[in-house]
Amino acid sequence: MDTNKIQGDKPIMNVEKIRQILPHRYPMLLVDRVMELVQNTSDSEPNGYIKAYKNVTINEEVFLGHFPNKPIYPGVMQIEGMAQAGGLLAFVSMFGDNVAEAKNKIVYFMTIDNVKFRIPVVPGDRLVYELKVLKHKGSIWQLGANAFVEDKLVSEAELKAMITEAKES
């Protein structure tokens, strides 16, 4: 798979491939598919990009309490989904297809800034995450993130993350 520039109507990463890279599992795995991915190839002129999505269903555990009579997908879950998509972008930019490397690495998010929630996300929505690399130096990544439902901006944030060695605890 050439991940330097991959796009189209078919997913380039399904949930099985995502689970090989991210350590998250149900109920906290918040990316269902990756539709587009451009590896970041330049630190001086960042060009990395990812488009991924999560299908929000009424079966999400979070709706048991948020809110039972008017379910709204929490903003914090939207940000976590953005962070997971950003982790995929950073990992693939650094290690390509080498999913074996994922066992030794973990992505930590350091800051989340300029968060805005614009429109509620509800069951039945497809939450589309679009992230681009703003800056990259070594293992540190700064990402601009937007989330959309039906092409309407529902939330946005700037994220800073680092990829580091995973330590056994």
Curated annotation (Swiss-Prot):
The active site is at residue 66. CDD domains: FabZ. It comes from the Bacteria. One of its GO terms (cellular component) is membrane. One of its GO terms (molecular function) is (3R)-hydroxyacyl-[acyl-carrier-protein] dehydratase activity. Its EC number is 4.2.1.59. GO terms for biological process: fatty acid biosynthetic process; lipid A biosynthetic process. It is found in: Cytoplasm. Keywords: Cytoplasm, Lipid A biosynthesis, Lipid biosynthesis, Lipid metabolism, Lyase. Transmembrane segments: none annotated. It holds the Pfam family FabA. It catalyses: a (3R)-hydroxyacyl-[ACP] = a (2E)-enoyl-[ACP] + H2O. Involved in unsaturated fatty acids biosynthesis. Catalyzes the dehydration of short chain beta-hydroxyacyl-ACPs and long chain saturated and unsaturated beta-hydroxyacyl-ACPs. Belongs to the thioester dehydratase family. FabZ subfamily. NCBIfam families: fabZ, PRK00006.1. This is 3-hydroxyacyl-[acyl-carrier-protein] dehydratase FabZ. It comes from Helicobacter hepaticus (strain ATCC 51449 / 3B1).
